[in-house]
Amino acid sequence: MRIEEDLKLGFKDVLIRPKRSTLKSRSDVELEREFTFKHSGQTWSGVPIIAANMDTVGTFSMAKALATFGILTAVHKHYTVEEWQAFVQGASADVLKHVMVSTGTSDADFEKTQQILSQNPQLKFVCIDVANGYSEHFVQFVAKAREAWPQKTIIAGNVVTGEMCEELILSGADIVKVGIGPGSVCTTRVKTGVGYPQLSAVIECADAAHGLGGQIISDGGCTMPGDVAKAFGGGADFVMLGGMLAGHEESGGTIVEENGEKFMLFYGMSSESAMTRHVGGVAKYRAAEGKTVKLPLRGPVDNTARDILGGLRSACTYVGASRLKELTKRTTFIRVQEQENRIFNSL
């Protein structure tokens, strides 16, 4: 047993210090970025925000809606091969440019993903997603995926430390997904005692990945647009959002009605709800590590997307970053004990 004494920080522990700026307007800020990925050699440009690969976020409808903003969607892994084919046939090239195919690490997952990619070569991203990216089996699967799909951009996660980030990149991942336990409907930290404050994880993993020519995704922990700005400021190349995009018309959750008001169910992918839906229940050897919540219906996702992008542009103007790429270079975090005036939060 050992104890690390250095303090680890989450988004709530810091604010971004404002700096002098020559920007006259938020409209002067360029949020699009261009990346050429280490292993695939593919080049992509767009707004580096990703809708999470959750049942009630990463849907085909969400992908079509967010592509109009240049935002990516990691489509959840539970669509069939036939559903994928129908979606691809009816989607424009611009939409497909912003779509990731998600997969687990079982043999069945591999075969299904192989079929989807062979039938739809326009799809360029594969997101290999497990809750715990520290297993040897996971590293081996990433290497197998790289060998099978050499020209696809591969995302692998989740991890929270630099050495594992490096391991995944060296095994064939172009992008590493960072985050254990920060999600709004994730209970891993309280069920297992395992986790890592998200901002520190992002800072440390970004340093490791960038040293090898890879990228990272900050996955989880964002509750408001300011958190998205902090993730980018900490060095994240992409930011993945779940709860902030849940509850919309495009989210795909079950709608329930209580006392005349409609709500949409949103649940973690390791929750009892998810496991009951996809594998018939929680296995005897494990515990659910997610929860289910009811969200008031929020209408189309367009307004939320604009709010997030507007907040991000504003953050850039406060530190004088004319492009999103410059935000991390212009960011100085200050430690704080308060974030906002909460006097009217209960109203």
Swiss-Prot record:
Catalytic residues as annotated in Swiss-Prot or TrEMBL: 186 (thioimidate intermediate)
Cystine crosslinks: none
GO MF term (any one): GMP reductase activity
Catalysis: reaction(s): IMP + NH4(+) + NADP(+) = GMP + NADPH + 2 H(+)
Gene Ontology BP terms: purine nucleotide metabolic process
Coiled-coil regions listed in the entry: none
EC number: 1.7.1.7
UniProt xrefs under InterPro entries: Aldolase_TIM, GMP_reductase, GMPR, IMP_DH/GMP_Rdtase_CS, IMP_DH_GMPRt
NCBIfam families (UniProt xref): GMP_reduct_1, PRK05096.1
Similarity annotation: Belongs to the IMPDH/GMPR family. GuaC type 1 subfamily.
Name of the protein: GMP reductase
UniProt organism field: Klebsiella pneumoniae (strain 342)
Lineage: Bacteria, Pseudomonadati, Pseudomonadota, Gammaproteobacteria, Enterobacterales
